[in-house]
Amino acid sequence: MKITSRKVVVIGTGFVGTSIAYSMINQGLVNELVLIDVNQDKAEGEALDLLDGISWAQENVIVRAGNYKDCENADIVVITAGVNQKPGQSRLDLVNTNAKIMRSIVTQVMDSGFDGIFVIASNPVDILTYVAWETSGLDQSRIVGTGTTLDTTRFRKELATKLEIDPRSVHGYIIGEHGDSEVAVWSHTTIGGKPILEFIVKNKKIGLEDLSNLSNKVKNAAYEIIDKKQATYYGIGMSTARIVKAILNNEQVILPVSAYLRGEYGQEGVFTGVPSVVNQNGVREIIELNIDAYEMKQFEKSVSQLKEVIESIK
């Protein structure tokens, strides 16, 4: 698919949707940004607020509230709409309500004649990415969930903070569900190219126990933020904007998005967070890491949980 207008539609103007819009404008990613919400006044108000800062943006951008007809010639439709996760809830607790919302939204988008790429940020994202694909009838590669992009940035940030190293020099992934069953891939985590398990032998700032604690901290990061401020949105806003950038610029970059497995990691028939090459066509291919036996077992458990939920909402 060739990117033509750099037009992006964001559906859902809550905290996440507006954070994504704000991030895209500040990074100069789009030429036209359309906001859609069930509350038209909210969408119009957010568009006006964003427009007030356009003179300070990198590029002049058309920002407006719209409707589903605007999806027809959009390059990307980002969906963030849904019920928010509340304190004490897991992301999977949201599934039934948000699956109905997702089906309704995707149906209306496709009725417009949309022929671009979907980016899904609504939770539980792996399940709702599957629902979006199933409803749209598009090829799986054109439905991209945010997956574990946010978890991965949290992972790198926490490890970098512990080691007092720039996060950009830390490489590693969280894979599987964006949620409680996610898996830290320590077997492929490196610091400046050096495997983490080799690195900690000579580094007294971190030990094996710290690695386990760090994984748990990353897994529970959203709960901590929700307890303190009721919602998470800046991190996922920037993470989603990064995916949009990769698509619009045809980057061929590897990001841990929620992608459809066709036998990779011994799994199929499910969307989940795995390192994937992202370009203007969505997911070009999945990078299959040779993870260790423990990580594979945890990944299989994560995928199994997702499949159970998918079966329950069919």
From Swiss-Prot:
The active site is at residue 178. The modification Phosphotyrosine is found at residue 223. It comes from the Bacteria. Allosterically activated by fructose 1,6-bisphosphate (FBP). Pfam families: Ldh_1_C, Ldh_1_N. GO terms for molecular function: L-lactate dehydrogenase activity. PROSITE patterns: L_LDH. It is an enzyme of class 1 (oxidoreductase). GO terms for cellular component: cytoplasm. Pathway: Fermentation; pyruvate fermentation to lactate; (S)-lactate from pyruvate: step 1/1. Beta-D-fructose 1,6-bisphosphate binds at residues 156, 171. One of its GO terms (biological process) is lactate metabolic process. Substrate binds at residues 85, 91, 123-126, 151-154, 232. It catalyses: (S)-lactate + NAD(+) = pyruvate + NADH + H(+). It is found in: Cytoplasm. Belongs to the LDH/MDH superfamily. LDH family. Homotetramer. Catalyzes the conversion of lactate to pyruvate. This is L-lactate dehydrogenase. It comes from Lactococcus lactis subsp. cremoris (strain NZ9000).
